Amino acid sequence: MALEKSLVLLPLLVLILLVLGWVQPSLGKESRAKKFQRQHMDSDSSPSSNSTYCNQMMRRRNMTQGRCKPVNTFVHEPLVDVQNVCFQEKVTCKNGQGNCYKSNSSMHITDCRLTNGSRYPNCAYRTSPKERHIIVACEGNPYVPVHFDASVEDST
């Protein structure tokens, strides 16, 4: 009788441990979609020629911790509009992958580039407001942006 219970409980215990081992590392870990939003979305503001915009935003969004992120782009459009890019013109990503999409229309963005000579922990950025098409990599269910690949000028 005790052996029968052990034979039933052992696989159940193994299954529970496997599930916990699989779920635990993802607890508290930022998803790729959330990371994209943190690093690239700034729907609440319009592009700013304020020279301190990038310095403030890069710090605020935790992109200057441990190192200075060399380049970053903020998109100043509603999140739903950026998510809809995942269903627009399919293009090849810079890395050769086939999950990138180009926006049908220009979007308001701000490019942030590390200035020459800037070193961690004193990360200093050049702020460049622009209006360009964006290219994002999408994945998941729901299918959403997970990587900002590039911005391109209107070809018309």
Curated annotation (Swiss-Prot):
It catalyses: an [RNA] containing cytidine + H2O = an [RNA]-3'-cytidine-3'-phosphate + a 5'-hydroxy-ribonucleotide-3'-[RNA]; an [RNA] containing uridine + H2O = an [RNA]-3'-uridine-3'-phosphate + a 5'-hydroxy-ribonucleotide-3'-[RNA]. Transmembrane segments: none annotated. The active site is at residues 40, 147. SUPFAM superfamilies: RNase A-like (SSF54076). InterPro entries: RNaseA, RNaseA-like_dom_sf, RNaseA_AS, RNaseA_domain. Residues 33-52 are annotated as: Disordered. It is an enzyme of class 4 (lyase). Disulfide bonds join 54-112, 68-123, 86-138, 93-100. Residues 1-28 form the signal peptide. Coiled coil: none annotated. It comes from the Eukaryota. One of its GO terms (biological process) is defense response to Gram-positive bacterium. Residues 33-43 have a biased composition (Basic and acidic residues). GO terms for cellular component: extracellular region. Its EC number is 4.6.1.18. Pfam families: RnaseA. Keywords: Disulfide bond, Endonuclease, Glycoprotein, Hydrolase, Lyase, Nuclease, Secreted, Signal. Glycans are attached at residues 50, 62, 104, 116. Its main location: secreted. GO terms for molecular function: lyase activity; nucleic acid binding; ribonuclease A activity; RNA nuclease activity. Substrate binds at residues 35, 38, 69-73, 94, 113. It is found in: Secreted. Endonuclease that catalyzes the cleavage of RNA on the 3' side of pyrimidine nucleotides. Acts on single-stranded and double-stranded RNA. Belongs to the pancreatic ribonuclease family. Monomer. Interacts with and forms tight 1:1 complexes with RNH1. Dimerization of two such complexes may occur. Interaction with RNH1 inhibits this protein. This is Ribonuclease pancreatic. The lineage of its organism: Eukaryota, Metazoa, Chordata, Craniata, Vertebrata.
